[in-house]
Amino acid sequence: MMLYFTDAQTQQSVAVNAEYIVVVFTAKNEDGSEKVVINTTTGNLVVTEPYLDVVGRLNAVQ
């Protein structure tokens, strides 16, 4: 199932196949703000959605 998130860098909507998500975590930027990172089998995606929203969407399809 595809999940849609907003890419933090481009502000574009990005589709991510839930089957390929490995882990979701938060990381601090250079300015100290926290961003949510989705790690997939092909790389990382930094998104603008809150951590609990991302995890909630992922849990809904599992």
Residue ranges, per PLM feature:
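Acidic, Ser/Thr- and proline-rich intrinsically disordered linker/docking segments
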Residues: 2-62
